């Protein structure tokens, strides 16, 4: 079951082959990183020269249009779009904190969470809830 992952800004394909390709920035340095497209698989391929340590905050952007992928709803998360077999489509929301295993697949019907740091508390990507 192959999903296509796309940039929410330019609709460019982010997984032309096996991995999702994103630009990552941290402490004035940038690199292309490869993420697993499999939900719950948190393995990341990072160049040796681009050192990341647990709890580092990483800024992700589209490698095609360079737009920031930080979520407008939660600055500690990034988001991209996905489309799967049939009409299944939605948003993937994932942590920008290196080593923080938290990913959500959000569709019109449901939210699926993956990772030991993910949980239902406070997760609401439909916009309903308390007013700020």
Task: Report residues per predicted region.
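Short recognition patches in nucleic-acid-associated and regulatory proteins
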Residues: 6-53, 73-91
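Short Cys/His-rich metal-coordination motifs, predominantly Zn2+-binding knuckles/fingers
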Residues: 8-10, 62-67
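Short, intrinsically disordered terminal segments enriched in charged and Pro/Gly residues
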Residues: 48-52, 75-132
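Amphipathic alpha-helical interaction segments
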Residues: 68-72
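Residues immediately within or flanking Cys/His clusters that coordinate Zn2+
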Residues: 4, 59
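Acidic, metal/cofactor-coordinating or nucleic-acid-engaging core segments within structured domains
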Residues: 55-57
């Amino acid at each position: 079951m192959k999903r296509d992952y796309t940039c929410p800004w330019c609709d460019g394909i982010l997984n032309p082959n096996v991995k999702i390709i994103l630009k990552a920035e941290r402490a004035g340095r940038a690199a292309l990183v490869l993420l697993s497209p499999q939900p719950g698989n948190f393995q990341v391929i990072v160049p040796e020269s681009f050192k990341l340590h647990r709890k580092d905050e990483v800024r992700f952007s589209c490698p095609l249009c360079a737009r920031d992928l930080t979520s407008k709803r939660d600055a500690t998360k990034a988001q991209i779009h996905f489309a799967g077999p049939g009409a299944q489509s939605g948003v993937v929301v994932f942590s920008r904190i290196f080593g923080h295993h938290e990913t959500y697949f959000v569709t019109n019907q449901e939210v699926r969470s993956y990772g030991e740091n993910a949980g239902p508390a406070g997760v609401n990507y439909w916009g309903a809830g308390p007013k700020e």
